[in-house]
């Protein structure tokens, strides 16, 4: 699957893809309880296409890549809990280099960042996996300056916020965890 995805992505294959693939190959997924998948807003900022209605598992598309990954994980390891984590807020950059709202700025002719998150949530629901909304649930347009180093990347405080939220999300249904707040 990895090789096929890289072939379809061609020159859009990330530089560290081989390292990631080799790392994944060393894991024994039969010993793993939970897999967390988190996308940032890079696909949106690059204007990458989001979905292909004719091929919902097209790995060259934002949701197609997610759908294909969920299909593979669920078919090979049905015992694993999967948590899909949405991107946090990211500023779009306009033609003049200014940070602008990603809720109004369209890169590829049809989609704003929140549409990516909605599609990601929809894919998660189709596969009956957990979905953790970071766009509206943690780092938002209102507080992004406090948690980002630039328009996209989390600072230490932002990483800690997401880690704390993930820990809570991961353990919420564990016996007594929610009552420890």
Positions of PLM-derived features:
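Catalytic His-Asp segment of secreted/periplasmic serine-dependent ester chemistry enzymes
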Residues: 87-181
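Active-site cleft segment of glycoside hydrolase catalytic domains centered on the general acid/base Glu
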Residues: 48-65, 101-109
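Generic structural signal for well-ordered alpha-helices
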Residues: 66-70, 114
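Hydrophobic beta-strand residues in large extracellular and virion-surface proteins
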Residues: 35-37, 70, 82, 121, ...
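Structural recognition of the beta-strand scaffold that forms the well-ordered cores
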Residues: 33-38, 81-86, 127-130
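Conserved SGNH/GDSL esterase-like catalytic core that processes O-acyl groups on lipids
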Residues: 1-56
């Amino acid at each position: 699957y990895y090789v096929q995805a890289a072939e379809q992505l061609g020159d859009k294959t990330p530089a560290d893809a081989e390292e990631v693939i080799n790392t994944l190959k060393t894991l024994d997924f039969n010993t793993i309880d939970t897999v967390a998948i988190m996308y940032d807003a890079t696909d949106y900022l690059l204007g990458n296409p989001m979905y292909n209605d004719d091929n919902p598992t097209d790995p060259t598309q934002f949701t197609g890549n997610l759908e294909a990954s969920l299909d593979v994980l669920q078919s090979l390891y049905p015992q694993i809990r999967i948590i899909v984590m949405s991107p946090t807020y990211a500023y779009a950059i306009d033609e003049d280099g200014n940070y602008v709202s990603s809720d109004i700025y369209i890169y590829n002719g049809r989609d704003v960042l929140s549409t990516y998150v909605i599609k990601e949530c929809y894919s998660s629901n189709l596969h009956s996996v957990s979905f953790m909304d970071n766009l509206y649930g943690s780092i938002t347009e209102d507080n992004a300056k406090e948690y980002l180093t630039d328009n996209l990347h989390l600072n230490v405080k932002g990483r800690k916020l997401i880690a704390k939220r993930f820990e809570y999300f991961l353990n919420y249904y564990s016996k007594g965890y929610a009552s420890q707040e």
